[in-house]
Amino acid sequence: GPGHPLDYPKTAEVYRKFKAKKKIIGICLGFQQILSAEGGNIIQQKKIYHGYQSVIEVLKTSRLFRSNSTIYGGRYHSLKLQEPFKSATIDITMRCKKTNVAMALEDKTNHIYGFQFHPESFLTNNGKHLIQKILSA
């Protein structure tokens, strides 16, 4: 959706309520919402990515996806995670190869996952596979 995670305090409330109880998948603003609720700062990007396909690299921090592999992800966002971001439980698990912007997260202790890009987009290859891996985790 449009806006900044701080525009949606009730969503942050719901996230905190279900954090350790339910599997959570955040996509785009949901990804930003998770990071914001965990102390991350979400900022404006220099370039806006609406309807843009990026090459995204899977990092070694991922427990679900094969590290050093790449996917193509459909991006529709103007905000990003300000780094560095430190968390005891959340790892950034994918990055845009060109800009190094955080593109995915996995929580080590809770079943929380997120994508900055849109796995359901026609611009994303294997998006269905990404969601299926999370649902079966």
PLM feature spans:
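Conserved strand-to-helix beginnings and helix N-cap segments that scaffold or border functional pockets
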Residues: 8-12, 86, 127-128
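Acyltransferase
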Residues: 122-137
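Pocket-forming structural segment of enzyme catalytic cores
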Residues: 17, 24, 32, 36-112, ...
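Flexible gly/pro-rich beta->alpha loop and the following alpha-helix that scaffold active-site loops
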Residues: 1-26, 31-32, 38
